[in-house]
């Protein structure tokens, strides 16, 4: 996954700060977490995007 795609998945601009990445990841995971009946596909996408952006 590219950094640009990771920003797109997390609904952020490419100049987002580390804190904004964390906040977006947390917000989105609360919506799609598999333990809450959400999608494992989207959870994996958000996890990968966070890993790409935060290392």
What are these regions (language model features)?
Residues 1-55:
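N-terminal J-domain/J-like co-chaperone modules of DnaJ/Hsp40 proteins
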């Amino acid at each position: 996954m590219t950094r640009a795609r990771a920003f797109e998945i997390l609904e952020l601009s490419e100049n987002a700060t580390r804190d904004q990445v964390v906040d977006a990841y947390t917000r989105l995971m609360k919506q799609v977490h598999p333990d809450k009946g959400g999608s494992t596909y989207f959870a994996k996408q958000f996890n990968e995007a966070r890993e790409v952006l935060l290392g």
